[in-house]
């Protein structure tokens, strides 16, 4: 069994924010595979399906970003899942828009959602970091992450989300490098990298 969580903030006013790219990726995965209708459990929206023949839970915490670990921790404990079977998808200021990095474990780089998960669950899980870029001034970070994706972002965002959904099974198989290569190739094929 696997748990894939996307980070974001609940509510219509946040749905197109850069900070919600994790939710967007989960929605893309949901639409690409046969998953159950969303239900509410563990302070989250959750759906069940199969990816690569493995039972997989998709989860979108409804606790707001800074408390994401509460919902994720509840789900991991309830399903008795090991951190090696947990993937989280979230926004990354320190990557250019449209870039992706995957790593196991590590620090939180100041991301409050990741801080919360680390505190509630531990640190040895797979992280898919999706670049949203960093504004020129530190004072603009809050406004940037809670700002909506722009029209120019729509040149790369749908392609990135589609590539993640199309290739997520590679991560479940343990092929981190191939996952990264396939996403990079998909973006290059659309002249986006």
Curated annotation (Swiss-Prot):
Catalytic activity: an N-acyl-L-alpha-aminoacyl-tRNA + H2O = an N-acyl-L-amino acid + a tRNA + H(+)
Subcellular location: Cytoplasm
GO annotation (BP), single: protein quality control for misfolded or incompletely synthesized proteins
Pfam short name (any one): Pept_tRNA_hydro
Active-site residues, record numbering mapped to chain: 19
E.C. code: 3.1.1.29
GO MF term list: peptidyl-tRNA hydrolase activity; tRNA binding
Annotated site, Stabilizes the basic form of H active site to accept a proton, chain positions: 91
Site feature Discriminates between blocked and unblocked aminoacyl-tRNA, where: 9
UniProt-annotated binding residues for tRNA: 14, 64, 66, 112
GO CC terms of this entry: cytoplasm
Entries under InterPro entries matching the protein: Pept_tRNA_hydro (IPR001328), Pept_tRNA_hydro_CS (IPR018171), Pept_tRNA_hydro_sf (IPR036416)
Superkingdom of the organism of origin: Bacteria
Keywords from the named record: Cytoplasm, Hydrolase, RNA-binding, tRNA-binding
Catalytic class of the enzyme: hydrolase
The protein's assembly and partners: Monomer.
Function: Hydrolyzes ribosome-free peptidyl-tRNAs (with 1 or more amino acids incorporated), which drop off the ribosome during protein synthesis, or as a result of ribosome stalling.
Record family assignment: Belongs to the PTH family.
HAMAP family in the record: Pept_tRNA_hydro_bact (MF_00083)
Protein name: Peptidyl-tRNA hydrolase
Lineage: Bacteria, Pseudomonadati, Pseudomonadota, Alphaproteobacteria, Hyphomicrobiales
Gene: pth
